[in-house]
């Protein structure tokens, strides 16, 4: 083994030199230079500084504006709650630990931070899956003129919580475990060892199949079918400038959604699976740290893609921030945009509203 394993940690550094120390007790500057920890702390501070206001404002604006409290928007609120979990219970601990060069809060808080970071990340992931399914049902109409109501929205939110808990809770009860990862300043599931006492192998396979491959397939299928539907509607109305504009806007939004998903999860899943399938191989601490923080950044760019680029949400936010007046003069334009005459596909339905 080219790393050092303890009771509740795994350090990607051999202890042949005697330098390796518990990441709960000593700075880990033998893994990376101190300036890298400072950069990490500054980056987490940036995510907190921007991510908290954006996600909190989403919830506040929805309370202020009744027209936003629609079934199709419930999952967006769930996404904001998921991001706040990551910001409040994950990013804050990681920032302070990075300032000290190790996870200063101990093994119990490592479980706490790992649980809430995983819970928030998984809630966010499955919220994107539910959003994709919602858009597919509403726009592609595979079930005919299906009316999406509050009951369906509540079921979608409950589903995201169930799936998130099915991933975040097992390490707390003995199926895998939470360990400091990367530069040892944040915690996540154990991809690093095949410790039979925790059945790590089966848990990692379960996570990769159920919590990455399945969401990947569902999101690509739903948005692929959505694009086909929009293009077919546009082709049937080639003379309509509004239809062509709607097609371009919907295509842009779908591309951004898919890119956001790929940037967030593919690096993390790929590196984690590589480490798991190459037990004992050499890898640096930053090898796992960088992909993990791509995933954490989703708390910032998911709200930008799904909420701030939504015209209805954006106008309501501007109105709230400007004390009830929208200086852009678009207060009533957020209800619906660019509907096609045949399919009733709108940018607001996709982006979502």
Swiss-Prot record:
* Glycosylated residues (UniProt): 2, 15
Top-level division of the source organism's lineage = Eukaryota
Please list the GO terms describing molecular function. Answer: 11-cis retinal binding; G protein-coupled photoreceptor activity
Q: Where is the composition biased (Low complexity)?
A: 336-353
Q: How does it sit in the membrane?
A: Multi-pass membrane protein
- Could you confirm whether the keyword Hydrolase appears in this record? no
Q: Where is this motif: 'Ionic lock' involved in activated form stabilization?
A: 134-136
Record-annotated site: Plays an important role in the conformation switch to the active conformation: 113
PTM note says: Phosphorylated on some or all of the serine and threonine residues present in the C-terminal region.
Query: One Pfam family from the UniProt entry?
Result: Rhodopsin_N
Q: Identify the SUPFAM superfamilies for this entry.
A: Family A G protein-coupled receptor-like (SSF81321)
Keyword DNA-binding found: no
Where does the record say this protein resides? Membrane; Cell projection, Cilium, Photoreceptor outer segment
Give me the ranges of the annotated region Disordered.
330-353
Do you know which InterPro entries this protein is assigned to? GPCR_opsins (IPR050125), GPCR_Rhodpsn (IPR000276), GPCR_Rhodpsn_7TM (IPR017452), Opsin (IPR001760), Retinal_BS (IPR027430), Rhodopsin (IPR000732), Rhodopsin_N (IPR019477)
Q: Give residue spans on the Extracellular membrane side.
A: 1-36, 97-110, 174-202, 275-286
PROSITE patterns (UniProt xref): G_PROTEIN_RECEP_F1_1, G_PROTEIN_RECEP_F1_2, OPSIN
Biological process (GO), any one: visual perception
Q: Which cysteine-cysteine pairs are annotated as disulfide bonds in the entry?
A: 110-187
GO cellular component terms given for this protein: membrane; photoreceptor disc membrane; plasma membrane
Q: Which residues lie on this side of the membrane: Cytoplasmic?
A: 62-73, 134-152, 225-252, 309-353
Can you tell me which family this protein belongs to? Answer: Belongs to the G-protein coupled receptor 1 family. Opsin subfamily.
What exactly does this protein do? Photoreceptor required for image-forming vision at low light intensity. While most salt water fish species use retinal as chromophore, most freshwater fish use 3-dehydroretinal, or a mixture of retinal and 3-dehydroretinal. Light-induced isomerization of 11-cis to all-trans retinal triggers a conformational change that activates signaling via G-proteins. Subsequent receptor phosphorylation mediates displacement of the bound G-protein alpha subunit by arrestin and terminates signaling.
This chain's protein is named Rhodopsin
Species for this entry? Petromyzon marinus (Sea lamprey)
Q: Which gene name belongs to this protein?
A: RHO
